[in-house]
Each structure stands twice: as C-alpha cells, then as structure tokens.
C-alpha cells in the first residue's frame, strides 16, 4: 500500500527532473560559452593593457577617462602598461601610443585622417561633420581644409607679422585693463585678447567685443572638453548638460551676428577685393552651393577660437619659463637686439630668429598645451607588429613621447635639447602628414612676433617665485592651468625704467 502511494510521487519527481535538466544544461552551456568567449577575447589581443574581465575592464577604463581627463588617463595607462597599449573608451577599443615609430606611422598615413568622439557630443557643440577640428567626415573635412590652408599660408602668412605686431602694441599700451590692484598682469586674458584680435583682423574683419567673446570662447571650450567622450545617455538628461548648452549657445549666437554683418558687408561692397579674406571665401562658397550655412559658421567660429584656446596658453607658459630662467631670457634678448634692434619687426626677420625658435620648440616640448592627438583607423593595418582593426580609436600621446626619446635632457627645460637638428619623427608639436595642424606656420610667426615685441618692452617676473612645474593644471583634451586656483598673474617691468610696473 505504501509503495503504491509512493509510486505516483516517483513518477512526478522523475518528470520534474527530466524537465529541469534541459534548462540547467542550457544555462551551464551558455555560461561556459560566455566564459570561453571572455577567455578567448582576452587572449586574442597581443597588445598590453588592462584585462577585459567580463566587461569590467572596459567600464573601468572608460570611467577613468571621464574622471581623470583624456590627457591624465593616457599618461596613467602608458606609465602602467607601456608605450603601446590598449584600453576601451565607450566600449570601443582604443590604442594609446607614445612610441615615436608608431606615432610616425599613424601621422603619415591617410587612413588615419579621421578623429573620434561622441557623436551626440560633437553634434551638441556643432563640430559633427562641420568645421575642421573634429570633422570626422573625410570628404567634408577635405573640402573645408582647402579654405583653411589658403588663409593660413601665402598672403595671410605675410600679413600676420604686421597685423599681430599692431595688435600686441595696442594691447600693451592699455595694459591697465588686465592688471589687478597689486599691479600684477593677468597674462592669460591679455594673450587671449591679443590672439582673438589678431585672428579677427586677419580672417573675419568685423568689430567685436573682445572681453565678452573671450569669456564665451572659454565657456565653449569647457563644453567641448566636457562633452567629447560623454555616453549617449548623458544627452537624454537635460539637467546634466544644461550649463554646457548655454555656453555653446552664447558663443554661437554672437558668432552668427558677426557673420551676418560680414555677409551684408560683402554683398553691399562696391569692390569685392576690398573685403576678401577667409570668411569671405567661405561665404562665397556657400552662395555657390558648395558649403552649407551651418558649416560656414562653424568654420569661422573655429578659426577665431583656435588661437585664444591654445596659443594664448602656450605663450603664457613660455613667459613663466622665461621668468624662471634668466639665462634663457638673456640669450633671447641678445638675438632680438641683433636681428631686430629698435626698428619694427619684419617678415624677413622670422628665419633669422633661431634662438627664439628653439626656445618656442623647447617650451612646447617641456610644457605642452596640446599633448595628444586623437585619430581613428579607417582600414585594417599593422603598426609596429601589432594588428589594428578598422574602426579602432587611437590616441597619440606626443607629450609623453617628447620626454622619452632622442633629447639629451628630456626632463629638463634647456635650449641644449634643440642645439642640434631634431628629426621630425621625434618632435611633433603640430603633427605632420595629411592631418597636420593647418596653422603651424602662421602659429610660429605669431608666437615669434609676440615674444619679440613683448620682451623688448618688458621684463617678466612671477610673484613669489611661481613656476610652471608647481602650477596646478588640468590635463584633458588639452593641458591648461587650473584657473580656479589663482596665482597665475605676472609682473611686467618696463625695460626703459627701473620702476616696477605696479600701481
């Protein structure tokens, strides 16, 4: 009787087991397959870097970039894993390279002319398939690059000396506008206004409010830097991006007003030759249907923000280095007096200012502003023996590269590092190849003119022996001083007087 009662239970248990086993088997098989996939994924890559570990590795590396900033994260990973390593940004494989042979390979080949970044982020700031800086559409990028190259060479390069010299002189004559109560000069603001004024006179030619535009350029740059790598979900939560939206809108609205004034001037001019410049060329291309209005506006915006964004900080660092190294200042002044003397600086002086040029190069090597380059592989390739798949993101850590190879004293600031010719594969402050900086030649002229005119009039000092080495900095898309920390002002002492330039 008992056996008969238990018999149905036996059949029920057997039935349950027979149903559960297939599901358990499937789960075990899926788990095994997933683990095999993870195991194989980790071992298919011969490139050093953090492990994948069930997707946790990519998440951690992405969060590190968002938290530390691009430049700081790159330096961390290169120091930890080597000079050619693999991480992930937004789930995409990304190579960080600070080895000169690999950097040279990437820069010289045309299948690395695209950059990478968050599509919604680039759309947000107006750079997605527009302008030149982060335009990742190779066809559209080539189309606008022609206009930039024309404006930044030839007649534009020749005019730069006079235009820049006039702007510097004008701003130094009203230095009180950028001095505080102690008489210390806000050098960053001074340089940003000079660079904006020079760029405007060369490329747009419409009067503007320097003070207001400089502030808005900084807001735009902060938004660009903050949004470049943000995940898509960030742009679905308005309160997260609202402050950046305002910064972008403020600058773009001002630029649109200025460009509309330029359009009216062009179309009402009796002689078109009287207003031919970069902006005019673009507006005429728009009229011919070759470029959209949005693309034209973005190109002009980028041309005007480029120098105030990077070159102003570069010169700022140079002046701090001069203040700390009086023997370098002495060498510079000796050459300036020999080549230029008391007359106005001319175009033919540029090639003769060799010490000034070496100083500029050493400053950009020792304390760079743009110390990384972002690219994307447009086809499969092999770099120094490592396979690189199409679509792989690449960051060239040139700031670190400049301290690793060739230079006799890589960790010191000294003109000895450029006493001999440096092969360009070891020193790339402007890049080279098909996507090299379009403004590298005009930038050198601009920096030489700025240094010559400023140093002829003033000796520069820093309060309390401040220096670039101890300065707080932020290393993200570019390397800037932390302006919230203060202590960035300098003392300008007129060379024709022993009296300190204070109130």
UniProtKB/Swiss-Prot annotation:
Any matching Pfam family: p450
Membrane-related topology note: Peripheral membrane protein
Protein residues bound to heme: 437
GO cellular component terms listed in the entry, alphabetical order: endoplasmic reticulum; membrane
E.C. designation(s): 1.14.14.14
Reaction(s) catalysed (UniProt annotation): testosterone + 3 reduced [NADPH--hemoprotein reductase] + 3 O2 = 17beta-estradiol + formate + 3 oxidized [NADPH--hemoprotein reductase] + 4 H2O + 4 H(+); androst-4-ene-3,17-dione + 3 reduced [NADPH--hemoprotein reductase] + 3 O2 = estrone + formate + 3 oxidized [NADPH--hemoprotein reductase] + 4 H2O + 4 H(+)
Keyword annotations of the record: Heme, Iron, Lipid metabolism, Membrane, Metal-binding, Monooxygenase, Oxidoreductase
Known role: Catalyzes the formation of aromatic C18 estrogens from C19 androgens.
Protein name as annotated: Aromatase 1
Native source organism of the sequence: Sus scrofa
Gene that encodes it: CYP19A1
